[in-house]
Amino acid sequence: MNRKETLIWSIIDNVIVACDIPRDDGTHSITRESIVSKSREENVVMARALVVEQMVHAGFTITSIAYILNRTVQATRYLFKLSTEFYRTSRAFRLATSEATLMNKDVEPIFV
């Protein structure tokens, strides 16, 4: 795995840690697979929007993020716009954003 892939997965893993809620049976509500899947579950959509926001902050282009998340560019732009709306209306999203930002503070923007 190269440095870029390591950075991508560390951002995704940090967002999962910030957004995940452990279930009673020991499973997790959000996984890597659910982030890149087509799930419309609210928690997964919020986590996906947070991934897009954090990756834009890290310096990735919308096109790269769309490829990573297996989405169209338009859907990725919509997720980025949705993250602003979630931030404005959801306390849980604001808490997850602050936690993920703290975990990703050592991630410096990359310029390719």
Positions of the model-derived regions?
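Short, amphipathic alpha-helical "recognition" segments used to contact nucleic acids or chromatin
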Residues: 43-60
